């Protein structure tokens, strides 16, 4: 079965799981909601459905893998946030091989990213290696790269080592804006306002996302400061860029264009082929100008991390060296 068919099956499973687990008038459901009792709420849902849906994701990735031709990774999104509304702390978690845990670690288990890293350490000891990479730190309201732990404790060398062991890379640009820098953080950089999304994701009305602690240049400075203070550098990470479209489709051809979950690519206006309406201008399109980066020739190092990222259409061109 192709990836798209498997994902359709997975999406239908999730729809049935979340929308119709029980009647909305079920007293046990309302007791869980009104008392904010997570343990009671979890008893309501069918965990077998949850596990089978995750198994479909794992099998879809492994079935589509063609060594040397098409590389797939098993992965999911850890969609956590702080207790403050819309402070995004999302991470993508990607597994190194075809081995995956029976179920992923989610915000249902904990909203603390440090608990995610400890879980990753634990399954790594069992032979299941993975990395997590934060994305949309620009919408974290300054919480992604804090100078303290999730619960406000001082940073430490142990914290820095734990974070860097599990989060050696950050997604600095994607469809919901760049997380490189911000005009308030880099006032002398004329490019600092490139594809900035000021609001926290999903906030209605839009709530301003505080820049300091949410952008990678600022994080690099904070990491150096932490190291200078003797508490290690928790922000010595590489960079990538992505689309965050959630559709597994690359924007390779205009006549087969995929973008953010079908909501911003359904017609020429939404794709930006014609002027965009005022209400859609806060959506950063998954496209852009062409730029080139020249790589030094040499062997590809497995596990190497780049220091740049790009969203939208990107390609790698290789030219053989001219004979001397």
Description of each model-found segment:
Residues 4-320, 324:
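Extended, charged catalytic domains and RNA/DNA-binding interfaces, predominantly
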């Amino acid at each position: 079965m192709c990836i798209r068919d498997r994902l359709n099956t997975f999406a239908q499973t999730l729809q049935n799981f979340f929308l119709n687990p029980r009647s909305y008038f079920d007293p046990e459901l309302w007791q869980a909601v009104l008392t904010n009792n997570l343990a009671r709420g979890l008893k309501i849902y069918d965990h077998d459905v949850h596990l089978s849906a995750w198994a479909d994701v794992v099998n879809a990735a492994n079935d589509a893998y063609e060594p040397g031709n098409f590389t797939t990774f098993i992965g999911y999104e850890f969609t956590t946030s702080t207790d403050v509304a819309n402070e995004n702390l999302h991470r993508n978690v990607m597994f190194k091989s075809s081995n995956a845990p029976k179920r992923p670690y989610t915000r249902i288990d904990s909203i603390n990213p440090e608990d995610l890293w400890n879980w990753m350490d634990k399954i790594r000891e069992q032979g299941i290696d993975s990395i997590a990479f934060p994305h949309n730190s620009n919408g974290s309201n300054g919480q992604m790269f804090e100078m303290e732990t999730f619960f406000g404790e001082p940073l430490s060398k142990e914290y820095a080592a734990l974070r860097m062991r599990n989060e050696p890379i950050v997604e600095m640009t994607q469809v919901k804006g760049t997380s490189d820098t911000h005009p308030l953080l880099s006032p002398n950089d004329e490019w600092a306002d490139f594809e900035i999304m000021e609001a926290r994701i999903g906030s209605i009305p839009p709530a301003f996302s505080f820049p300091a602690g949410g952008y990678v240049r600022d994080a690099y400075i904070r990491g150096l400061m932490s190291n200078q203070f003797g508490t290690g550098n928790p922000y010595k990470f590489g960079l990538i860029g992505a689309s965050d479209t959630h559709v597994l489709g690359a924007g390779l051809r205009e006549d087969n264009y995929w973008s953010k979950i079908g909501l911003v690519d359904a017609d020429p206006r939404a794709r930006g082929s014609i002027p965009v309406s005022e209400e859609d201008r806060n959506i950063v399109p998954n496209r852009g100008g062409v730029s080139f980066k020249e790589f030094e020739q040499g062997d590809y190092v497995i596990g190497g991390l780049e220091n740049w990222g790009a969203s939208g259409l990107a390609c790698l061109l290789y030219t053989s060296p001219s004979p001397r």
